[in-house]
Amino acid sequence: EGENVRVCAIKGNFDDAQTGVKKIFTTPSVAEKLAENNMLFSSANSINWGRLLPQIVYYISAYCDLVNDGKIELGDKINVVVPTGNFGNILASYYASLMGLPINKFVCASNSNNVLTDFIKTGVYDKNRNFYTTISPSMGILVSSNLERLLYKLSGDNDEVTRGWMNALKSEGKYEVSDDV
């Protein structure tokens, strides 16, 4: 049981770990070696769509619970407040809203690594800043992978524009979106 699972430690923060994982996913020689051994590489965090799907469901389920408990009427809009680092959980609520869940406002709670808060306020995403170790390590992220998925939707599903922002983030450590996004 669990003989094909390994745990390893890294020196660094979440961003360092996630960068390494993404590199493994995109390294052809690793994919070839895994295929030779009839194996797949997977991630259990929110860079994997399989993690977001049940989160979408629990927003819908929570809304139904509020209706069934008489806290709100069917059709009433709710506010969603999520402590956010990699942007996956709150993105799931956004996808639920695209499916018809009536949401009034999305609130991204942050810690001192407030790259998302600054981005939402200014339209500038800048990872070139100090990283702070806090008591909320899952929020200790300077590169929020799931924000790319939101930007794709907000850009009208424009993969070229989205890719441009992500390339700028990779090469310069920052990008800026236009006011219409």
Model-derived features with residue positions:
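Active-site/ligand-binding loops adjacent to catalytic centers
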Residues: G2-R51, I56, S112-V181
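Domain-scale recognition of functional cores that engage charged ligands
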Residues: T19-G20, E32, E36-S97, L101
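Short alpha-helical "patches" and their helix-cap loops
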Residues: K71-T84, K105-N111, D159-G173
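Active-site histidine-anchored catalytic micro-motif
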Residues: E1, V82, N89-L91, G100-S110, ...
